[in-house]
From Swiss-Prot:
PANTHER family: AUTOPHAGY-RELATED PROTEIN 22 (PTHR23519:SF1). This is Proton-coupled antiporter flippase LtaA. GO terms for molecular function: antiporter activity. Proton-coupled antiporter flippase that catalyzes the translocation, from the inner to the outer leaflet of the cell membrane, of the lipid-linked disaccharide (anchor-LLD) that anchors lipoteichoic acids (LTA) to the cell membrane. Displays high selectivity towards the headgroup of its substrate. Plays an important role during infection. Contributes to S.aureus survival under physiological acidic conditions. GO terms for biological process: lipid transport; lipoteichoic acid biosynthetic process. Changing residue 26 to A: Flippase activity is about half that of wild-type. Mutant is insensitive to transmembrane proton gradients, maintaining basal activity. Shows a strong growth defect at low pH. Pathway: Cell wall biogenesis; lipoteichoic acid biosynthesis. The N-terminal hydrophilic pocket is crucial for flipping activity. The central cavity of LtaA shows a unique amphiphilic architecture. Keywords: Antiport, Cell membrane, Lipid transport, Membrane, Transmembrane, Transmembrane helix, Transport, Virulence. The chain crosses the membrane at residues 15-34, 46-73, 80-99, 105-126, 138-159, 165-184, 211-231, 243-263, 275-297, 303-326, 338-358, 370-390. Residues 1-14, 74-79, 127-137, 185-210, 264-274, 327-337, 391-396 are cytoplasmic. Flipping activity is inhibited by increasing concentrations of gentiobiose, a disaccharide with the same chemical composition and conformation as the anchor-LLD headgroup. Not inhibited by other disaccharides such as lactose, sucrose and trehalose at a similar concentration.
Amino acid sequence: MQDSSLNNYANHKNFILMLIILFLMEFARGMYILSYINFLPTVTSIAVAITSLAFSIHFIADASTNFVIGFLLKKFGTKIVLTTGFILAFTSLFLVIWFPASPFVIIFSAMMLGIAVSPIWVIMLSSVEEDKRGKQMGYVYFSWLLGLLVGMVFMNLLIKVHPTRFAFMMSLVVLIAWILYYFVDVKLTNYNTRPVKAQLRQIVDVTKRHLLLFPGILLQGAAIAALVPILPTYATKVINVSTIEYTVAIIIGGIGCAVSMLFLSKLIDNRSRNFMYGVILSGFILYMILIFTLSMIVNIHILWIIALAIGLMYGILLPAWNTFMARFIKSDEQEETWGVFNSIQGFGSMIGPLFGGLITQFTNNLNNTFYFSALIFLVLAVFYGSYFIVNREKAK
């Protein structure tokens, strides 16, 4: 009994420390990717094309690394992989201090940061306890969201004081996360040293076995990301609000999401499978309705209400969807499978803005992008709703 209690305490301590490490790395990512490089064209000679390329390469590196990181963790162990990641992130962001306007350094740092964050995410997802998955996944996604947003806001404030003087803060945050890692005992589901060909065959096998999940993983990210390029224009040109009022809408949505992740996500645990199905299906349908409604809104107060509803639903849909995916994963393939899932999700987030921007540009109508995003959630609702009904009938 005492050994069990000590083991539970150790697992809890490791989980909390990994949450803090995830928060710090996402904090650094928010500072650099969402704030620093976006402001560079306004305060230095860096061209917008360079920062846009850096932004894209960051997420390409992230998605590509996710595809193989689970296998690398099993082959080389967590210490080598994570330490390498911290070295890459720290070194690349440290270079920004000395070369704040170098196109090569800006792009290189973005790529290295994308690679470095990948193993931390995979370890977090594979270490969640099954009987507490909804609750713990709420904490994981909360740490991710809080880190990104606070990092972005914090760097925005520092840039207002001086555009490049506080660049050292980014590498400092990574260094703190790196030091904390040495107080964590990370355990994988198993270790193997299989040859590369065998690991490639396993990637193909994992992909084939989870094809049912890929539409949901890919299209959810694409549908949300498709709105990113048009939302600022929609807010300022259609609703005619200030940047501050638009920011308030984002903050309200973030607060709703945070509250849902911290308090509502635990509802997923110890509930029936049908309850989980209901949350997922309701989430897809509600998203479709809310996003479609955005195309007709011209009042900022109604927009704030919709932002709150979207945030609340997102905060419970993510853990529910994660729990649904987890039921398909073999216990000894946690790291590999979550890595592949994260990679597919990353590609969805990359193609979403591309489609959203192109639809608006070629149709010259912002509403068409809202219709596109809403249609995706309608397709997901029909596809997975049909699966849930068929699966429920088979279970009887």
